[in-house]
């Protein structure tokens, strides 16, 4: 099993701008939407992790807009955790049109793990079971 997730999204009218295309800020929201799905699919849902004292804020995000999505388009949003160190992780995203396969946007986000008090957490030290799960999914036999 890889650390990947996917979801579909029907573009809503309120997500478009005056030109009738999806406003660029919505892609970042869609990244969060699929990232939440990804963590649920690998058994590490955000809600449960936060209840257990692990928060994973975004520390950087980028998006490259390729083509325009419009109202009523269905897009597929894919995410993959591409790097995990025990303290940080990086996610890569691709948004494409469901009907045509045309890529609409590609992006990345970087995250760390913190306590509810805002202190950096090493999952390897503080949550070894969660660390093992993520390490195996992302790094396989390589040690984080």
Feature map (PLM): residue ranges:
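Residue-level recognition of specific faces of alpha-helices
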Residues: 27-30, 57, 92
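Hydrophobic residues in beta-strands and at strand termini
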Residues: 9-13, 65, 113
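Hydrophobic beta-strand-centered segment that forms part of the acyl-chain substrate-binding groove
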Residues: 38-89
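A broad, structural micro-motif
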Residues: 22, 56-58, 104
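Short, electropositive, low-hydrophobicity segments enriched in small/polar residues
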Residues: 24, 47, 122
């Amino acid at each position: 099993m890889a650390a990947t997730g996917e979801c579909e999204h029907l573009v809503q009218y309120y997500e478009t701008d005056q030109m009738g295309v999806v406003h660029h800020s919505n892609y970042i929201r869609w990244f969060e939407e699929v990232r939440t799905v990804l963590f649920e699919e690998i058994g590490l849902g955000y809600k449960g992790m936060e209840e257990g004292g692990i928060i994973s804020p975004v520390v950087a995000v980028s998006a490259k807009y390729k083509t325009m999505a419009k109202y009523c388009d269905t897009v597929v949003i894919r995410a993959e955790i591409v790097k995990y160190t025990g303290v940080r992780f990086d996610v890569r995203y691709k948004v494409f049109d469901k009907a045509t396969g045309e890529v609409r946007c590609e992006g990345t986000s970087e995250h760390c793990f913190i306590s509810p008090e805002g202190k950096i957490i090493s999952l390897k030290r503080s949550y070894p079971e969660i660390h093992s799960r993520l390490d195996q999914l992302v790094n396989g036999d390589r040690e984080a």
